[in-house]
Design a protein with these regions (language model features):
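Catalytic/RNA-binding core of pseudouridine synthases
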Residues: 1-240
């Protein structure tokens, strides 16, 4: 065990602190304050909000190969070096930020490159479920590119690139993108509908996917109110 090994090293006057590990090249020494400062700087740089996270890492190829060969040779079933690196980083991040590590579905993924000493944060999508009613004809469900210029912009579409000035997708997604500081929105409606039909009753279900949202905690009731207000204004304007 560890205690017996320490005693033997002491009797033989061997200082293990001065010995480089032939398997991992002391890679765990890189999990230091400098690394966690880089992570913190990246979080602050992006201004990203999260409650759950996952850690992924890149370690030198030769270390990975030695670890694999050792496990294969002695039929070891212990955790790999890379998994141990991820576990230790995740534990430290939990201590620092009081956020939970989540393996199935997480807000962000910390990708730690121990080869080039770089940190990258992958921001996972935010999904918002809802229903909508359409009380006026002539509004498409999704953004409709101009049929003449194919979305590039021309005189026919007043250089908007759109066949119709508004869509259900745009009315909803623009507000959410602004609040989440997301990169892009994708509208997933439950089925398609013709532009000249109404959507009454309990509404049509949809899921709005926000890619790379910096903020995740938004007031959905306020979003609903803002979307309705803008839609009413657009309807009133178009009817005048």
């Amino acid at each position: 065990n560890i205690e017996r090994a320490d005693k033997v090293c002491e009797e033989l006057d061997i200082n293990l602190d001065d010995v480089d590990c032939v398997i991992c090249d002391n890679i765990f020494d890189k999990l230091n304050d400098d690394l966690y400062k880089k992570i913190d700087d990246k979080i602050n740089q992006l201004g990203v909000e999260f409650d759950t996270f996952l850690v992924g890492s890149k370690i030198p190829k030769d270390i990975q190969e030695r670890d694999d060969k050792l496990s294969a040779k002695f039929n070891l079933t212990v955790e790999t070096l890379k998994k141990e690196v991820n576990r230790l980083i995740g534990l430290r991040l939990w201590e620092i930020y009081d956020k939970e590590a989540e393996f199935e579905s997480q807000d962000i993924v910390f990708n730690i490159d121990l080869v080039e000493s770089k940190v990258r944060i992958q921001i996972n999508p935010l999904y918002i479920e809802g229903k909508y009613n359409k009380l006026q004809r002539g509004i498409p469900q999704t953004k409709w590119p101009c049929t003449k210029c194919k979305g590039r912009g021309c005189e026919e579409c007043n250089f908007t690139g759109k066949q119709y000035p508004e869509s259900v997708e745009e009315l909803i997604s623009e507000h959410v993108l602004k609040l989440t500081k997301g990169k892009e929105a994708k509208f997933h409606g439950a089925g398609r509908e013709d532009i000249d039909v109404l959507m009454l009753g309990s509404g049509r279900p949809f899921v709005l996917e926000i890619k790379e949202p910096r903020l995740r905690k938004i007031d959905l009731a306020q979003v609903e109110e803002d979307v309705i207000d803008e839609a009413v204004d657009d309807i009133m304007e178009s009817s005048n």
